[in-house]
A protein has these predicted regions:
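Acidic/polar N-terminal loop/beta-strand segments that form early-domain functional surfaces
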Residues: 51-53, 63-67, 112, 123, ...
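N- or domain-start disorder-to-order transition segments that initiate the globular core
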Residues: 4-58
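Short solvent-exposed loop/turn micro-motifs enriched in small/polar/acidic residues
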Residues: 31-33, 250-253
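Active/ligand-binding-proximal structured segments within catalytic/core domains
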Residues: 45, 52-102, 176, 280-293
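Divalent metal-dependent phosphate-bond-processing catalytic cores, especially two-metal-ion Mg2+/Mn2+ enzymes
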Residues: 300-303
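Charge-rich, well-structured scaffold segments of protease-associated domains
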Residues: 2-21, 41, 88, 95-252, ...
Length: 451
């Protein structure tokens, strides 16, 4: 658009008889002072977080503690449909108006979800915040879920399931959670087959009513004034007060799931219970993950510095891949190794990868510890360079802690992790009850009790 305006102004200038004005080269440039993230918690429990980064583009998100872990046996898959229902008719705007209204200002509206949270976000030019904010508030607070519109989502649910089925990694990770937990976190991100076509408008309304309450929400903005965001929260996101339905604490049990198919590659994940968000050991597990290796840091690189790659390479001459797996939730976590190998070498690869974790449990060198900390800090800081990554970091912390830790504080927390902390984290994996998920030709793949 900038280029188009420039051309328009140029054509006007060509037909003008007036002399062009001289630029005042001595005029001072406007200097913007760097801003810090501002966080406010309203009496209703709603958290407002914002950062005015002076960007011409703004990004606003509503974070809700309403992931699939809060589904019950009666409404399994409801969060999957909510992801697809963001553009359906609301009490304040039709589906057509939402679609065309956001499109008309060059904005975008999207929904993502995890096992913990649902995130509704909008992007737009700074001048159109009011317009897209109206649609964001409508979608999150006043959905109608007309039965015929909900019914039309069935084909999209089936498509999502079919696309997910084509990803071995997705199948293994979903199966791993189902095997590892007795409840809550065992729920899938996708609607189970037996519920496809059976999640109706009543299920969706009840889930919204019980989980989309002020105390379970955070309104987060980039490139927006904090007072404006606070006013929006006070006026429009306080319609449902209270804590909503109390979530059940996750119960780790350990288990195994095996999916036998004709693939020549075996995907396998072996984990123990890890660290929950907010605990002292969560940072130690993150450093341990980078000590072991999380993938190449150079495009098309060999990842030769990874301890997992080094260890497994001694056990097989076949192609393989191995990385540390680490995921953290509000009350639990999973830590272990994820391997991809030829079916004939699966057993050797898995056992060699676990052997590397055992080696770290015996001690880690200062050089490896320093390298892992540097990689972790770089990964975190680079994730904040995109508006999406920064908004996610702000929203996740606001929803979990009601506050925001600056990158400097996070870096200090990483630096404070000692070699003993990392060894203790590795020992927790080694001694913990294992969970395992595998897919492929599993003839040579060991069972969880054999490793």
């Amino acid at each position: 658009m900038k280029g188009i305006r420039g051309i328009s102004q140029l054509s006007t200038r060509l037909y003008s008889a007036q002399a062009a004005r001289k630029l005042d080269v001595a005029a001072e440039h406007v200097k913007f002072q760097p801003q810090d993230v501002q966080v406010t918690k309203l009496p209703s429990g709603l958290v407002i977080a914002s950062l005015d980064n002076y960007s011409p583009a703004s990004r606003i998100g509503v974070f809700v503690k309403a992931g699939c872990r809060y589904e019950s046996p009666d409404n399994q898959g409801v969060t999957h449909l909510l992801r697809l229902a963001a553009n359906l008719t609301t009490k304040g705007a039709s589906a057509f108006r939402i679609c065309r209204g956001v499109e008309a200002v060059g904005g975008s509206l999207g929904v993502t979800s995890s096992r913990e949270n649902m995130i509704y976000s909008v992007d737009c030019l700074r001048d159109h915040i009011d317009t897209v904010m109206e649609y964001l508030i409508n979608v999150t607070t006043a959905p109608e879920f007309r039965p015929w519109e909900v019914s039309d989502l069935t084909s999209r649910v089936k498509m999502d399931r079919a696309l997910a089925a084509q990803s071995p990694q997705m199948g293994v990770i979903e199966g791993l959670h189902g095997a590892a937990y007795k409840n809550t976190l065992s729920n899938s991100l996708y609607c189970p087959d037996y519920m496809v076509g059976h999640v109706d408008a009543d299920h969706m309304h009840n889930f919204i009513q019980n989980n989309f309450t002020s105390a379970r929400m955070a309104l987060v903005g980039l490139g927006v004034d904090h007072d404006v965001l606070k006013q929006v929260g006070e006026q429009f996101l306080n319609i449902r007060s209270g804590m909503g339905t109390a979530g059940t604490k996750a119960q780790y049990r350990g288990g195994e799931v095996r999916v036998q198919n004709g693939s020549s590659l075996v995907h396998s994940a072996v984990v123990s219970e890890g660290a929950a968000v907010g605990t002292d050991e969560v940072m130690a597990f993150s450093v341990l993950q980078h000590v072991l290796g999380v993938g190449p840091h150079i495009k098309r690189g060999s990842n030769s510095t990874s301890k997992l790659i080094q260890g497994v390479a001694k056990a097989t001459a076949d192609p393989f891949d191995a990385s540390a797996f680490n995921v953290n939730y509000s009350d639990s976590g999973l830590f272990g190794v994820y391997t991809i190998s030829q079916s004939a070498a699966a057993g050797d690869v898995i056992k060699a990868a676990i052997g590397q974790v055992k080696a770290v449990a015996s001690g880690v060198s200062e050089a490896d510890l320093t390298r892992a900390k540097t990689q972790l800090k770089a990964e975190y800081l680079m994730s904040l360079e995109s508006s999406e990554g920064l908004l996610d970091a702000m929203g996740s912390q606001a929803l979990t802690r009601g506050a925001y830790h600056s990158p400097e504080v996070i870096a200090q927390m990483i630096d404070s992790v000692s070699a003993t902390d990392v060894a203790n984290a590795a020992n927790k994996f080694v001694s913990g009850k294992k969970s395992m998920a595998s897919s492929g030709n599993l003839v040579k793949t060991p069972f969880v009790d054999e490793i």
